[in-house]
């Protein structure tokens, strides 16, 4: 079984979000599971630098100009690169300029990605041809459409990491991207009078996966589907929509081997975690106090992530004796709100605006509770890292958060399945009730340790996801 992942980023070469973490780990897990998985990426500068030994496979003239297809390896995974400097050799973000305006030629830049994904199934590399083209998010959404236009030379899977980003472009670009105009209708890639790369993936793929079972159900409902609910409900009824949970890359995220921590630990040596907490309190300007539960946020600061609720609930958290450490950036209003809280409560609130991968490990190793109060969350990786590190996740019941965290209710404690704290309604009062439950459990150290051990014993490895995808691919053959 030969599988080509078509996507726009891959950790650690280039990362703007969780998609990169998935592509950085899933193909390697699939190779270990017996699938010949490779990755197709645009040759953005950071990616090109990370694979300096890439060799020329072929050169082609395309609707988007002259391209060179390269092939190399990264961490044991075969990587194809679309080398087209006129499209991809730009500093900063792969999607927008320094003023945060989307590049005006994104329609060509990402149509080309989908086109090359299709051409790989038609023999672009004469020595390797995928049985399945697995496209990820809107950037690769045209791959299933091009495959459909070419008579489906390979099966296609389209994974939705976040339905909110839809890749919308003016209809006149149909000529530029060289897809048949017959594809431009409601039973195709047309959406609200424009081309939607996301809808192309949803409509033309042989199977759609979402990154959690709950999110796969949620996106058939209007409040989560951004207008795609009709199509997604139809795909669900046809048995062509399912959810596969993302995993944790244990080579990077494991408290037992994480060299970014002051002290490494396992579920059998949790007392070592205390040194990480002490170091984190010092680094964030918090009072060094092992008796105060340390709550943490590592997130984009947006309303989608529910960070306005954290700001609203913060006085209640602090009144009960808790501390907050926050690492993130985003909405200027939220940034100012958290910075003001840090100034008002020195020693209790520590804030770092920005994102630093290494420091996020230190927070995960040192905090007691990781807050993930998202309004919607397709899968979420932060809570999985929290479980792995014995940093109990406090989450809202939505998407992948609902699939991965079990509330520390009396019943779940008795059944030995409690792993964190879960609240239902997206408001500060509901969040505060969950915070209150966390304080109650914190007051019972032996019970807290029991839940930590339960959380750390859960298996969200990529091997589980790789097996699920392998079974899906074989069903499609």
From Swiss-Prot:
GO molecular-function terms, A-Z: alpha-1,4-glucan glucosyltransferase (ADP-glucose donor) activity; alpha-1,4-glucan glucosyltransferase (UDP-glucose donor) activity
Pathway participation: Glycan biosynthesis; glycogen biosynthesis
Pfam families tied to this protein: Glyco_transf_5, Glycos_transf_1
Reactions catalysed, as given in the entry: [(1->4)-alpha-D-glucosyl](n) + ADP-alpha-D-glucose = [(1->4)-alpha-D-glucosyl](n+1) + ADP + H(+)
EC number: 2.4.1.21
Superkingdom of origin organism: Bacteria
Residues the entry annotates as binding ADP-alpha-D-glucose: 15
GO cellular component, one term: cytosol
Keywords: Glycogen biosynthesis, Glycosyltransferase, Transferase
Main enzyme class: transferase
Single GO biological process annotation from the record: glycogen biosynthetic process
Family: Belongs to the glycosyltransferase 1 family. Bacterial/plant glycogen synthase subfamily.
Annotated protein name in UniProt: Glycogen synthase
Gene: glgA
């Amino acid at each position: 079984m030969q599988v080509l992942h078509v996507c726009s980023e891959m950790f650690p070469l280039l990362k703007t979000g969780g998609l990169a973490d998935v592509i950085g780990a899933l193909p390697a897990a699939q190779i270990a599971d017996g699938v010949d998985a490779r990755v197709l990426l645009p040759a953005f500068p950071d990616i090109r630098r990370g694979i300096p030994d890439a060799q020329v496979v072929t050169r082609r003239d395309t609707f988007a100009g002259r391209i060179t297809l390269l092939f190399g390896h990264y961490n044991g995974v075969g990587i194809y690169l679309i080398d087209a400097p006129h499209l991809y050799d730009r500093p900063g973000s792969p999607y927008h300029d320094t003023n945060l305006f989307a590049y005006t030629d994104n329609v060509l830049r990402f149509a080309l990605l989908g086109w090359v994904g299709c051409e790989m199934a038609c023999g672009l590399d004469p020595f390797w041809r995928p049985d399945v083209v697995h496209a990820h998010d809107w950037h690769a959404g045209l791959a299933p459409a091009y495959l459909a236009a070419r008579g489906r030379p390979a099966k296609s899977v389209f994974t939705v990491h976040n339905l909110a980003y839809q890749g919308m472009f003016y209809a006149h670009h149909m000529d530029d991207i060289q897809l048949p105009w017959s594809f431009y209708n409601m039973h195709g890639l047309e959406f609200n009078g424009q081309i939607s790369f996301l809808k192309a993936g949803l409509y033309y793929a042989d199977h759609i996966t979402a990154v959690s079972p709950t999110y796969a159900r949620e996106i058939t409902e209007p409040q989560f589907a951004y207008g795609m609910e009709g199509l997604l409900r139809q795909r669900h009824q046809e048995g062509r929509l399912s959810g596969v949970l993302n995993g944790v890359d244990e080579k990077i995220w494991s408290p037992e081997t994480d060299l970014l921590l002051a002290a490494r630990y396992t579920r059998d040596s949790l007392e070592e975690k205390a040194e990480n907490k002490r170091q984190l309190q010092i680094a964030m300007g918090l009072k060094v106090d092992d008796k105060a539960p340390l709550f943490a946020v590592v997130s984009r600061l947006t309303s989608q992530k529910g960070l306005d609720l954290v700001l609203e609930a913060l006085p209640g958290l602090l009144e009960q004796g808790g501390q907050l450490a926050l690492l993130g950036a985003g909405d200027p209003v939220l940034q100012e709100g958290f910075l003001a809280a840090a100034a008002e409560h020195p020693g209790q609130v520590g804030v770092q605006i920005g994102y630093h991968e290494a420091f996020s490990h230190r927070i995960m190793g040192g905090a007691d509770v990781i807050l993930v109060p998202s309004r919607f969350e397709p899968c979420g990786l932060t809570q999985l890292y929290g479980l792995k590190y014995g940093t109990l996740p406090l989450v809202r019941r939505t998407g992948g958060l609902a699939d991965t965290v079990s509330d520390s209710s009396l019943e779940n404690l008795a059944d030995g399945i409690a792993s964190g704290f879960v609240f239902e309604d997206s408001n500060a009062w509901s969040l505060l009730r969950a915070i209150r439950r966390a304080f109650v459990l914190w007051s019972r150290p032996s019970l807290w340790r029991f839940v930590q051990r339960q959380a750390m014993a859960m298996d969200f490895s990529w091997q589980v996801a790789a097996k699920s995808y392998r079974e899906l691919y074989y069903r499609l053959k």
